[in-house]
Amino acid sequence: MGPVTGMTPDKNIETPAAEKVPGLSQTENMGSLPEEVGAARPKASMVDSGTTDEELTNLNWLHESTNLLNNFSLGSEGVPTGSPLYDIEGDLSPSGCQTPEKLSASSKPPYSFSLLIYMAIEHSPNKCLPVKDIYSWILDRFPYFATAPTGWKNSVRHNLSLNKYFQKVERSHGKVNGKGSLWCVDPEYKPSLIQALKKQPFSSALALYTPPTSPTSVSSRSSVSSLSSVEEVYEFIPKNSRAGSDGSEGFHSEDDTDIDYEEDMLGDSGYVSQPCINPSSNDLHGNKLRKEACQDIDDELKEAAGSLLHLAGIRTCLDSLLKTAKAQSQKHRK
């Protein structure tokens, strides 16, 4: 019995020593392993305060990363808000957020097609232009459209015909032989166009890059004077030649108007009923448009009729199958 009791303390003494060795090895390994290993062993008895300090440091790093979010929010202050005058084709490009000095002559202008048309019409002496003269004004002021896809002309025509800000007017008696139609700005919606024009990116840099003006000019800019607003825009619009702009923005000769008459698709589209000078050509063009519209409607009706017949056939088959199944079920019951 004596040796038995003597061995018991020895085992008790050796057992803690055996437990301390793995414990020390665990703490040494934890100091060298990444912090994820320490987080995966929450029940370890020998975890020191250094590991918790490292974890807190990581949390502080995450807290400091909010400065990056602040930088992103500060960098987005210069982006203008959306406007109903921004049509589909007139989306703001990245170059639209730059200052006027950084805008190159070949960069995309930060204006919608509605505003481009408005500026072109207001710069003309008679405040009305045909479609081809609007093209010429845009090409003179913005060389970007000289190499842009030709679809921008379709966008101009669509804005003229479908936009409520513009209306078709009758040619004066001095231009009896002229073809096509003239377009002007509806006075009812002119204040909306002026307000949208002042919200463009150039307005924020207007006070920095324009020559000092008198208080009267500042008050006139806030009024509903379309001419003053348009002239402010011209200070930042890239031009190929400013000297010849005044003479080229009026009415062109009759020969020039006849050459580009085919491009004036809106001249006789009939969106606004106005007296016409040449009824024969208008009748021919109107008949052609009506025939094309009728052809499209006939094709759509044929497709719809075919779909209805197909659905009717499916419904008939389903009804016959239901009747057959019902008759068979009644026979089985009998």
From Swiss-Prot:
Keywords annotated in UniProt: DNA-binding, Nucleus, Transcription, Transcription regulation
Region entry Disordered, spans: 1-52, 83-108
Lineage: Eukaryota, Metazoa, Chordata, Craniata, Vertebrata
GO MF, any single term: DNA-binding transcription factor activity
Broad class of where this protein is predominantly found: nucleus
tRNA processing recorded as keyword: no
Entry-linked SUPFAM superfamilies: Winged helix' DNA-binding domain
GO cellular component assignments: nucleus
Source organism per UniProt: Xenopus tropicalis
Localization: Nucleus
DNA-binding region: 108-204
Family matches, as InterPro entries: FH_FOXN2 (IPR047403), Fork_head_dom (IPR001766), FOXN2/3-like (IPR047119), TF_fork_head_CS_1 (IPR018122), TF_fork_head_CS_2 (IPR030456), WH-like_DNA-bd_sf (IPR036388), WH_DNA-bd_sf (IPR036390)
Pfam family, one: Forkhead
Protein name (database record): Forkhead box protein N2
S-S bonds: none
Cited Gene3D superfamilies: Winged helix-like DNA-binding domain superfamily/Winged helix DNA-binding domain
Signal sequence range: none
Presence of keyword Acyltransferase: no
